[in-house]
């Protein structure tokens, strides 16, 4: 009888309540682990996007600053005044003449356009020069090269304009409409504010760089300090 009672009262395994508690605890643990995994994945993704955008903004800024700094007026046969170094000045586009190293045996000017296209890419377009007697140059109508400096520039109106232009007195020129040749000749600095982000709709990892680039050749020509 005693042996039967011992067997009767010797319960092994988990009770229903213990099983339910274990399942709840396991579920909570799995939720916590999933949350940590998602958070870590998002953090790594944001860090990667931030690094990519930083490199792209830096490279794009360096390329633009190099071209703008080399801007030079383009002498023409007539009229006596040379064409302005910057022939187009807008908030999201500019066209200039510059002497930059193109790997040529003789240094010749190049026509460069920096502009944001319909896909919000920052694109550099170049045209080669055609030499003429008297040290004069015109420019080919066929594009020499095109390259993308930044894949996704922040939407227009979301911050400062990509380009703003100032004269030797530091006065910013309005570019709501096309500038006159006199105004274009007065430009001696270009402030570039470049914001690069992962997509036009995602600004969480956006990177903004700003740089005021002087044009020493133009400043010397207009007699600025």
Stretches with model-predicted labels:
Residues 47, 79-80:
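Short, surface-exposed loop/turn segments at secondary-structure junctions
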Residues 53, 59, 63-79, 105, ...:
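Extracytoplasmic low-complexity repetitive segments enriched in small/polar residues
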Residues 11, 88-89, 187:
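A generic fold-level signal
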Residues 88-174:
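Type IV pilin-like appendage domain
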Residues 71-73, 81-96:
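Short N-terminal edge-element motif at the start of the domain
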Residues 3-4, 52, 146, 152-225:
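Short linear sequence signals and composition-biased patches located at protein termini or domain-edge surfaces
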Residues 80, 106-110, 207:
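Residues that act as N-cap/strand-start positions at coil-to-secondary-structure junctions
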Residues 2-73, 224-225:
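Aliphatic-rich helix starts adjacent to a transmembrane/signal segment
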């Amino acid at each position: 009888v005693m042996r039967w009672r011992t067997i009767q009262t010797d319960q092994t395994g988990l009770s229903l309540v213990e099983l339910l508690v274990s399942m709840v605890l396991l579920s909570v643990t799995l939720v916590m682990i999933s949350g940590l995994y998602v958070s870590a994945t998002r953090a790594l993704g944001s860090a990667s996007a931030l690094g990519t955008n930083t490199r792209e903004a830096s490279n794009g800024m360096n390329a633009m600053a190099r071209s703008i700094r080399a801007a030079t007026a383009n002498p023409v046969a007539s009229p006596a005044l040379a064409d302005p170094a910057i022939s187009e000045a807008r908030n999201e586009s500019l066209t200039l003449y510059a002497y930059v190293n193109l790997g040529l045996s003789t240094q010749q000017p190049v026509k460069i356009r920096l502009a944001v296209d319909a896909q919000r890419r920052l694109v550099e377009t170049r045209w080669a020069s055609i030499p003429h007697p008297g040290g004069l140059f015109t420019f080919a109508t066929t594009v020499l090269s095109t390259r993308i400096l930044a894949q996704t520039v922040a939407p227009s109106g979301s911050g400062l304009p990509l380009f703003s232009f100032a004269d030797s007195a530091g006065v910013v020129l309005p570019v709501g409409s096309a500038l006159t040749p006199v105004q274009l000749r007065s430009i001696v600095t270009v402030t570039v504010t470049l914001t690069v982000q992962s997509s036009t709709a995602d600004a969480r990892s956006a990177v903004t760089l700003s740089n005021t680039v002087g044009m020493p050749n133009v400043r010397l020509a207009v007699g600025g300090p």
